[in-house]
């Protein structure tokens, strides 16, 4: 809980006062105030409970070379059938962690029935690998896919420059670069109303055409150059992979169109803009605001952060919602985060895995790959 609170200080777990063991199998979590999304937080994989013998999940694991074999727990702990009864092959899982390109080829050659964890970085590998479109399953996730402003200095401390960068990106070109069914771009910080109490805040330039946006953004950069000289290159931190390369090409082109130069750097390096690619753990405006707030070392609005802290201390749900809505409007106006769309999460699934279902959290329990589960 402490670990999650460090990354989400204004989320549902902010109200946890104590965790008390009641019995060997029951714990009590005491809250200082009601939090409607606390159960969704507790359902995250990070909240799994471990014992000296391992986890509490449906499998026991055993190393097998570079792979891991997962065997159903009920077959090892005195289930309905004797232990010597052979375990059906369909109940055993063999898992590997490897590069996306190798996993995709392994799937194509039918040496693997499932590939999990696909992101935008590796999406362009599917077509040249000859993967059947019907095997590609996209998860209907929401969350953050965009650029956090993490640099400081005269250029990015200028509110008009941050707004110019945000409005200059032609998001309509992204689906052609990253083709996957059901994915949509967005320039909103929060995709839907959720618990905001009103529709998400629109940028004041949202109704402008792309040409009008670029003209306005270019004028901003021209004024900055006239007053202060040539702007420094923007360092953009992106992961490795062809999808990130295509994304950088679009960003470099669009920023160049308004007079800014861009340089790609690794995620481990200092950067001015850094890719954020996270699936929402729960459906609340607080999740989104917490991910781009001051606690994440992003160029942030202190006033918005103060409203978030006030929301945590609010004495009523109405006051809490009001504070959150005020924080959202301030964060959008600050332009410390540049939205691109929803995160992209995909899997490759064999036809025989008839229990596999799309997941709004991109989580796929391995004991639910067939309609009959262990």
Give the positions of each predicted feature:
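Gly/Pro-rich hinge or "lid" segments in bacterial periplasmic/extracellular proteins
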Residues: 24-26, 31-93, 98-102
């Amino acid at each position: 809980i402490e670990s999650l609170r460090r990354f989400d200080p204004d989320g549902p777990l902010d109200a946890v006062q104590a965790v008390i063991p009641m019995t060997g199998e029951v714990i009590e979590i005491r809250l200082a105030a009601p939090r409607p999304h606390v159960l969704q937080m507790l359902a995250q994989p990070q909240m799994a409970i471990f014992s000296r013998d391992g986890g509490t999940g449906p499998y026991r694991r055993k190393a097998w070379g570079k792979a891991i074999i997962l065997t159903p727990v009920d077959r090892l702990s005195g289930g309905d059938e004797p232990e010597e009864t052979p375990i059906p092959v369909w109940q055993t899982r063999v898992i590997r962690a490897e590069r996306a390109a190798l996993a995709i080829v392994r799937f194509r050659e039918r040496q693997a029935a499932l590939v999990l964890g696909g992101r935008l970085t590796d999406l362009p590998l599917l077509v040249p690998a000859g993967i059947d479109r019907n095997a590609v399953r996209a998860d209907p996730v929401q969350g953050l896919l965009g650029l956090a402003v993490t640099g400081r200095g005269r250029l990015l401390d200028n509110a008009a420059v941050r707004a110019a960068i945000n409005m200059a990106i032609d998001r309509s070109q992204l689906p052609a670069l990253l083709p996957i069914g059901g994915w949509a771009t967005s320039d909103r910080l929060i995709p839907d109303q959720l618990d905001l109490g009103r529709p998400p805040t629109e940028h004041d330039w949202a109704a402008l055409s792309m040409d009008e946006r670029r003209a306005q953004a270019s004028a901003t950069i021209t004024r900055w150059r006239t007053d202060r000289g040539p702007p420094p290159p923007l360092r953009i931190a992106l992961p490795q992979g062809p999808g990130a390369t295509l994304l950088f090409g679009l960003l470099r082109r669009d920023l160049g169109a308004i007079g800014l130069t861009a340089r790609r750097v690794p995620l481990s390096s200092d950067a001015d803009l850094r890719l954020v690619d996270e699936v929402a753990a729960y459906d609340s405006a607080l999740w989104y605001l917490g991910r781009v707030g001051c606690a994440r070392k992003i160029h942030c609005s202190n006033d918005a952060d103060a409203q978030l802290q006030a929301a945590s201390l609010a004495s009523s749900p109405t006051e809490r919602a009001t504070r959150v809505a005020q924080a959202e409007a301030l964060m959008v106006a600050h332009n410390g985060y540049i939205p691109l769309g929803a995160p992209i999460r995909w899997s490759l699934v064999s036809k025989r895995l008839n229990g596999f279902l799309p997941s709004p959290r991109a989580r796929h329990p391995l004991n639910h790959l067939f309609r009959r589960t262990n």
